[in-house]
Amino acid sequence: MNLTLSRLWLGAVVLIAVLGGSMPAWSQTRSLPDAPGTWKPWKPLSSTTGSGGVKEQAATSALMKAFEGELLALNAILRRAPGVASPVGFSVETWGHVAGYRVSEHAPGQPAAGKLPIAGGFTFGAFPIFEYERNGKTIREDTGETALQQFLVNQIGGGLIDRGGVADWGPLDTDAFQKPMPQGEIAGLPRYGDGLIIARDPAALWTPLPQRGALDLVVKARQLVVQEFEESMAAQTAQLAIVRDPANRAKRLKEAQEAAALAKMPDPQVFIKQIEQAIAIEEASLVKELDPTMGTGKSLADAKRALSEVTDWIAQLSPAELAAPSCYAEKGTTLRARFTTVAAAGCRPLVRPNYGYFNAALPRSAPQVVIITGIKRCFDTADKYNLDANSPSPSGCRANRALVETMDKEAIRAWLR
């Protein structure tokens, strides 16, 4: 040990002694893949979810109690799954949550808060068992990081099991998205995108977006771009008027003269000349920006042409073409190539949530659909670079797969209304 390290070590020992503490003796953790685990008690919904989602969904205390009762029923079903009923190498924690709800700005017909079933979720976590030495004692724990398995309840919106966004819609706040495509089955459950769906009719969860609806969103997105450039042009035009105003110019030069005098510059005319040059440069820059062949002026002209492109196209379409289901080809090089009503390779149907799927006659607390998310992370074992899926640990993904593969699907279907 060199002198510097020796001094650092001695200093640390002295500091601990002064503080009256002791130096804990730690050891590396040891994984215990054969140790028996346990199912820990359910975490109450009140401790795992905030009030935001409850308020947004206009849920009463009675509704929340009933919804938690449904989640507890699901917990009981999953707890009986042979693959995880008697945990070995991991312990299980389960809890629920209530999702938020908001009406999108561009979502005609989306129900108001309180008109849909309570949306939330159920989380299954298989945490590894390990131990370590501390101060001469063996400490065993079953916590830490793990791959969680989520079950979404009564949630059918975009972005849950697929990114689903449409670049041509920009940042518009809409409930429309690209439909998650079917990808076969896992453990007897249909896979759509990155999720497994348990429902009366998985394909009925979403309703087609008409071509008119898809193109209207393009119009709105491009109108926003035009508006932004128009606002920039207005600001730059106003600034150019100020720069060219003789009174403003005289004021700036007078202020320059006063500053030069206050600083006792040896040659104030040089400084004043610099200010005049700066004014000229600012004017030239603004003129360039406002030119329709360059800068903001050109960007505005381009944005207006792009807006006309879609509005002109809409005007050319027949009522039947506007009503046809829209399809989005992400790699299309033109607007018309991207938005088509003809299903083809690389083209995904555009959809919205089918709010009519939910039976309004049932209590709002009733579960009507479950989507198991994050399937790629834990089930894509063919990808050798997927470390989570191929982990040798009995916790995390291995336990998640055992749960999904051995859980009683018929009991879950019976649990759904």
Labelled PLM ranges:
Residues 22-29:
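Boundary at the C-terminal end of the N-terminal hydrophobic targeting segment
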Residues 381-417:
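Surface-exposed amphipathic alpha-helical segments
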Residues 1-12:
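Bacterial N-terminal signal peptides that target proteins for export
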Residues 33-54, 368-392:
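Acidic/histidine-rich, surface-exposed loop or edge segments in extracytoplasmic proteins
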